[in-house]
Amino acid sequence: MYKRQGQKSEKEKFAGARATYSIEAMMQDGKALQAGTSHFLGQNFAKSANISFINKQNQSEYAYTTSWGVSTRLIGGVIMTHADDEGMVVPPRIAPYQVVIIPVIKKPEDEDAIMAYIKEIQKDLAGKTPFGEKIRVKLDKRDRASVDKFWEWTRKGAPVILEIGKRDADGNNVMLKERIKLGTPEGKQILSRSDFEAGIVERLERIQKEMFEAAKARRDANIRTDITTPEAFRAYFEQSNEWIEDGTSGKVAFVRGKWCGDPESEEILKAMKITIRCIPFDQSDSEGICLLTGKPAKILFQNCYRRL
């Protein structure tokens, strides 16, 4: 999940706060998810709750308080950022299980040999530390068809799935499937056991990096910076209101541009069902024209998006 961070506008900040800062993540459909917030409350709430302290001058003073955090919406953010039509795609760093092993037992007499081979692999994997942590491996021994178990773990987004049968055990190989490459020639590989074990840490770290870079590239590709006048701004979002069956408009979702900072100008956005997501921390000193009023402006604001 890739995001932008900045300060909320006066109308979008938390009621009663002196300032609100947020992390805004772009979902695959172009909408913004406020993934986390931090509110500087000043002394407002301390006064109402009569919270005070003795300062350096040995005088009583109302406390300066904050309110901040993230919540379970991050789980939804991960799903909406990386999922595909087959289900979840979970980044290896946070996946409950980074490697899932599915025994493929076609004959009862093969079970002992297959399970003994899998236990050897599990033992070797136990010493692996992707991202500086002990690798998380799940052996799915449930009495269910292996194909059903594969699709269940695919829907759950397991980064790497191993399917190991008698032929693999006899050949000292593994059948490996990568979730992010599902349906591609690279998504299914037969590897020697030694190559798999030697490369699993690098593989998981590569998957993590590829997922991050894909989310970042999608975000950057869907931010317009070439809209520089109120007329172009209005025209863009009026055209973007035409939604097609799959839930998208064919238009990018975010616009980044100049704003004069006038709180009353946000009423223009309200009428258009658009919001200012944040005022990014990475500001430039260049002057421009406010996209809402046409007045001279220096403040760079970002993430206007269609509110359905």
PLM regions and their residue ranges:
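NTP/phosphate- and nucleic-acid-binding module
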Residues: 3-308
